[in-house]
UniProtKB/Swiss-Prot annotation:
It is a single-pass membrane protein. Its EC number is 1.-.-.-. Its main location: membrane. One of its GO terms (molecular function) is iron ion binding. Belongs to the cytochrome P450 family. Cytochrome P450 monooxygenase; part of the gene cluster A that mediates the biosynthesis of botcinic acid and its botcinin derivatives, acetate-derived polyketides that contribute to virulence when combined with the sesquiterpene botrydial. Botcinic acid and its derivatives have been shown to induce chlorosis and necrosis during host plant infection, but also have antifungal activities. Two polyketide synthases, BOA6 and BOA9, are involved in the biosynthesis of botcinins. The chain crosses the membrane at residues 15-35. It is found in: Membrane. Induction: Expression of the botcinic acid clusters genes BOA1-13 and BOA17 is coregulated by BCG1 during both in vitro and in planta growth. Keywords: Heme, Iron, Membrane, Metal-binding, Monooxygenase, Oxidoreductase, Transmembrane, Transmembrane helix, Virulence. It comes from Botryotinia fuckeliana (strain B05.10). This is Cytochrome P450 monooxygenase BOA3. Coiled coil: none annotated. GO terms for cellular component: membrane.
Amino acid sequence: MFAVELLERLGLPTIYLWIGFVLVVLLAYPTYFAIYNLYFHPLRKFPGPLIARSSYIWYAKNWIGGRWPHALSDLHEKYGQVVRIAPDELAFSSAQSWRDIYGHSVKGKKYFRKTDWYAGVGDLPNSISTEPDPQKHSAMRRVLANAFSNSVLKGQADVINKYLDMFVSQIKKHDNPNGIPVEEWFNWLTFDIIGDLTFHESFGAVENARTHFWIHLIINGNFIRSLYPIFQKIPISRLFMKWIIPNMDEIRQQRREHIAHTNSKAMKRANRDDIVQKDFFSFLLGKEGADTSEMFLTAQAHTLIIAGSETTAVTLTAMVSFLLRYPDKMKILIDEVRGAFTDKSQINVEGTLPLEYLFAVIEETLRILPPVPFGLPRTCPGAVIDGHVVPEGTIVSVSPYTASHDVRYWHDPEGWHPERWLPSDHPLHNPVFDQDNKEASKPFSTGPRVCLGVNLAYIELRMTLARLLFEFDMELLSKPVDWNTELDFFQFWKKVETRVKFTSLH
């Protein structure tokens, strides 16, 4: 080897020769890698920061640093609607790219398969959210689709109302001059609801007015899940995580405990034969020929609990925070809610549907703060995306946060304006928003892999916010936070303390 021969001529001992050789290799490989990526890679023509086009450093720094949605949005503002964010990855932000990447495979459109980013958790098999094979995913979706249909969810309103009644009662009991941290309380509510709908058994968080230990396990476990993309792109990074994150072993143990507890809950539910009101497991277990193995059921339960809790909780917290920052908009919604209902029993799935301003508040909050703000990566089969020829094997995605903040599609995209979602015949309709391209906002994705729980999310958001405004006046006690720019992101948004004083009206 030339490098070793060169070092031998210097008359150094053998050990130093090999140390020198290793150092040469360590320097030569990244140099070669960077030169290839910049000048010879099939994606070399796409714009982006030098450090992102040549290596994974930009990706790792911003993903681990908690500012991913904001950093990516800044890149699109600088470079345009397609940006190279890693040597093998492109990020898009156009409305058309939503359809090109995630849309249904019709009229010759090729299928964009999920990447290894979605690999199953631990020893669990793939679930409905992580399965990359389109045929296997379709089979899973057929099993669960009926569970999330509007007709079935309408029948689950009693479950939601049971926890809303308990939630309201606990607010009245525990409210004090210092208020209550609604970001924590909304977690209790959404975890209890999804726990009951999945396992026919809640976590008891609302009833006991404290965070169930499993909720802690889930939230903390999500942090290590957020590191998986870095481990995949830079395998050697696993060796350094203990130094970067000193409590990594503790976090990993919590992740294992979470999976074990999920398995225990799933098997307990699977072995029950006294269920009258159908829950999600009723559909998993009731489909003839469906996979009912222990690990499969655990994987589905893991996905259902995570997807149906934290995402809804952060949206509820953000809505309340925005409304309390803008009293004029809060008054409009209060008037709509209290003008529509005279009794809490009227606040149900159908009763909240006609409330147009409530719908607008929800949609605008989801636009400003998509619960899953990062782009869901897909492998390009070799296709044209929004006019760009993208080579086969390229990782591509659209960031919901970036697309919903793009000045090309929105008037004052950084402002929170529920009015932009009102129909033209509404008294508060403002024509300044008529040119907004609402197709750019896809908080639940789109196409055949659109979030299965979208109907449940809207029902919970409508019923919870309407019920709180019917029951209480609210006052923000904590320091106002710009939810649009100040939140950090680690797999999910990291909520900030939002203390609210509630004054009961009934």
